[in-house]
Amino acid sequence: MVLPSMNKSVEAISNNHLQQPNKFPLINGLADVRDYYVANCLLFKLNKGSLRIENEFGEFIERSAPCLFLLEKDQTITLSMSEIEGHIDFSSLEVSYDLMQKFYKVFYSTRNYNDRELSLKTKPKYFFHADLLPGMSDTFDSILHGVACPRVCSNVSIDDHDYSYFSLMYLISAFVRKPGGFDFLERAIKITTKEKVYNIIISDLTRKWSQAEVAGKLFMSVSSLKRKLAAEEVSFSKIYLDARMNQAIKLLRMGAGNISQVATMCGYDTPSYFIAIFKRHFKITPLSFMRTMNH
């Protein structure tokens, strides 16, 4: 059987960059990550502690472990993580747009009229949660360990692991038939100009991207690019900043280097400037973030 390609489609991130069981205390029992841009649909498994997620639309959810979250792409969120009995433990899988398209085709073919009607009558939801049923935690971990690349924050092919495609589909199926689930999937397969620009920039953050270069990649003029981004109420500089800050968060969480090295990998010439921008963006210094995530 030929499976849909999952090459560079799933990225694994854990609070423990060595991908071993980990429990760590937080500073003052609470860690906040503010203004984090969710670039791809995100599966988030909370093993220990509690988590509150809030987005720019005022939607929020708060749950204690163990549970699984599914977050929609193209939203900005604040994550508030609290320890329970001195610990918090989590892992995440970032699922690409291409892979969500393939899952959508499968789920769409199995839905019925009532599912569609329920979705239309439901207020849009940008994240869901599900209890961890028997086997779900092990399934998540098998995917996580199958694609994880210790200390290197990059997408990894899992084409050779046939079970991973169906395992991931199984986990996402836990959310599909929830109210608003199909509506969520339909939004997940649409891609904005903002997302296209983001994907180009983050593909090589060591490069100094100009609007003209990105416009050329998208086969449009600079004026057309500016017009499309203005219609989406976002600027080129904001997308550039989100890409750099997201990569910084991932690299720091994965332990991919010290602060100076991370600054360079994110396209910054000086560590001091990177630290200032990171603190202004996330309301926490890179060093405090590293201590929190990798203690």
From Swiss-Prot:
DNA-binding region range list: 212-233, 259-282
InterPro entries: Homeodomain-like_sf, HTH_AraC, HTH_AraC-typ_CS, Tscrpt_reg_AraC-type_HTH
Protein name: Transcriptional regulator sirC
Transcription recorded as keyword: yes
Functional description taken from the UniProt entry: Positive regulator of the expression of the invasion-associated type III secretion system encoded within SPI-1 (pathogenicity island 1).
Residues of the HTH araC/xylS-type domain: 195-292
GO molecular function: DNA-binding transcription factor activity; sequence-specific DNA binding
Organism, as annotated: Salmonella typhimurium (strain LT2 / SGSC1412 / ATCC 700720)
Outcome reported for the amino acid change (mutating P271L): In strain: ATCC 14028 / SGSG 2980 / CDC 6516-60 / NCTC 12023
PROSITE patterns assigned to the protein according to its UniProt record, in alphabetical order: HTH_ARAC_FAMILY_1, HTH_ARAC_FAMILY_2
Keyword line: Activator, DNA-binding, Transcription, Transcription regulation
